[in-house]
C-alpha cells in the first residue's frame, strides 16, 4: 500500500487490532511499524471499530488478516480516493483452489456486490468522516456486519451525492 499512497505524497498509517490473538499479531505488527490497539471482546465488528476509531487519517481501509491484496488494488483505491465523488468502496473477491460449486457461489456474491455496491468485509475503504457518522460497524451482529455497514454507507453516499465503487480488476 505504501508505494501507491506515497507516490501521491500521502502519509500512511497502519493500525492493527489485536483481538486476543495467540500468534504474536501485536508484536509482529509493532515490529513492522504498525500501531496496535487491543479489543478484548472477540467480535469482528468490535475489532474493526477499535482500529477504525484509532485511525487518524482522512480515509480508512479495513483489511482482514487473511486477505492478500496486490499493489494494484491499492493503486486503484488511491485513484478512487482522489475523486471527490467517492465515499468508499471495495473489491471483488478472488480465491484460489476452490471447487467449481464454491466458485459459482463466489461469482454470485461478486455480482451482488457490484450491482448493489456492497463491499465484502475482506476489503472495505471509506472516508473517515462517513465511518464516524455511521459510528462504525454494528455490535449487534456477529455475521454479515459488513453488509449492514455497506447499506448504511450507501445511504450516506446517496444523501451526499457520492458513490461507492467496487473495483473489478486491480
Predicted region positions:
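Conserved donor NDP-sugar-binding/catalytic core segment of glycosyltransferases
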Residues: 72-100
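A short, conserved alpha-helix in the catalytic core of glycosyltransferases
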Residues: 130-135, 140-161
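Short aromatic/hydrophobic "clamp" motif used to bind/position activated sugar donors
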Residues: 60
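A recurrent flexible, glycine/aromatic-enriched loop bordering the glycosyltransferase active site
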Residues: 88-97, 109-126
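Short, acidic, metal-binding catalytic loop of nucleotide-sugar glycosyltransferases
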Residues: 1-11
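Glycine-rich, basic loop-to-helix element that forms the pyrophosphate-binding segment
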Residues: 28-31, 39-55
